[in-house]
Amino acid sequence: MEAALTKLDQEEKRALQAYYRCAWEETKNIINDFLEIPEERCTYKLNSYTKKMELLFTPEFHTAWQEVFECREFIINFLRLITGHRVVLKGPAIVFTKETKNLGIPSTINVDFQANIENMDDLQKGNLIGKMNIKEN
């Protein structure tokens, strides 16, 4: 019985991970569509060091997203919809809170928009430098 439960838990985790991957892809696409510009301004990746997902923005979008009310509200509402979490804007951070079953999903996720300009070569080349880090609390 315990082995069956473990197998089910693993399948649930895989299904949930697949769902979150789809949610991140959809978030990226919708943000890019919402900005109505031909170039991609947003993408996402799994940080292999921290094992956390990151949304990456170009510098222009990173500095502007909070100043555009409709864009900020849209992103918050969309993240609320796809994650099922309660989403709150706290200064420059978006905070998700929700109790979940023990599927390896933290009950509180802090999404902190921050600029990463440690590598000036990246900045000069116009590479993505804005990050949205998901941190487990």
UniProtKB/Swiss-Prot annotation:
Q: Tell me where on the tree of life, at the top rank, the source sits.
A: Viruses
**Which signals induce this protein?**
Expressed in the late phase of the viral replicative cycle.
Task: List where this protein forms a coiled coil.
Answer: none
Q: Which GO terms describe its cellular component?
A: host cell cytoplasm; virion component
Tell me the keywords, alphabetical order.
Host cytoplasm, Late protein, Virion
Q: Where is this chain's protein located in or outside the cell?
A: Virion; Host cytoplasm
Q: What does this protein do?
A: Plays a role in the inhibition of the host innate immune response. Mechanistically, promotes the autophagy-mediated lysosomal degradation of host TBK1 and affects IRF3 nuclear translocation to block type I IFN production.
**Quaternary structure and interacting proteins, as annotated:** Interacts with host TBK1.
Family, per entry: Belongs to the asfivirus A137R family.
Give the protein's recorded name: Structural protein A137R
